[in-house]
Amino acid sequence: HTVVSVGTRTTHIVVVQNGVPLFVRIIPAGGESMTDALASLSGESRANLELAKHRLGLDGVSHSQFSELSRAMFEAVRPLIVSIRSTIGYYNGLEGSSPVESVILLGTDSRVPGLPRAVAENVQLPVRLVSPLEGLPLGSGVAPGAFDEFALDLAVPVGLALGSV
């Protein structure tokens, strides 16, 4: 698998096999590039632009009313998608490597509508969103859904915590 954690301004791409990271690439781009693209077209506040990004996403291209905004977001995130594809291509070309079979997306901005589909179309592999909390038991004092809003951003802390167990 290739695990892609889309951060605000940094994205981590990690090729993993049997739970072992084999190849890591850090890209100086993230979901904020889509917000920046919206800001260049609108005088709205950053908070409103973040909401628009997560409501409209990349799928608005087919709606004439929103096509310019979605197209701008797609163009802003395209270099990141190309980096994912080139990282997988590079790794697959290494002698003795097993081919990457899928992409796992993490990070709040991985939930931008249309982003998983755009990645899947460009890398020609199945893509799925995964919560780092999936399969982990939560304490009895933790309300169900307490972490839902930011669970996709917890990959690094959860990984570090599990690594120390």
Region annotations inferred by a language model:
Residues 1-165:
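Hydrophobic/aromatic-enriched cytosolic interaction surfaces used to assemble or bind macromolecules
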